[in-house]
């Protein structure tokens, strides 16, 4: 190859790469607001699953405050990242003003398919609803516990329970309740 051909090839490649990068940036700039709007709608849907009576959801520093139509506080939704068997488990949990759980949702997990992934099932998550205090422990580890672990996925079950218990302890410490 001649030196001129190599330089021409490099210049053409540089122009194509620069143009492609520019076009990609423009597409991102155009679609980002739509993507953000869609993400916000999905979050609102999730919040309404946890607090069906919630009308307004306000992001605070460490939680989402939930209000009804008359601006009365209904509770809070917390974001938890807890170590599971297969990696981090990302959880959203809602507490009412009395400290009882309104709902739990698993956003992300990488647990063992067919076993640990059962932590996302309604039958497991619904066990937490309406409970507080020692009731949130797995029966296997605490005589006052009311949560059944998933057979073959005790570590995953315990991770969800422990994450919720940590948030509950933090709430109690902040409010001065023992």
Q: Residues of each region from the PLM?
A:
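Flexible, solvent-exposed loop/hinge segments and secondary-structure transition points
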Residues: 2-178
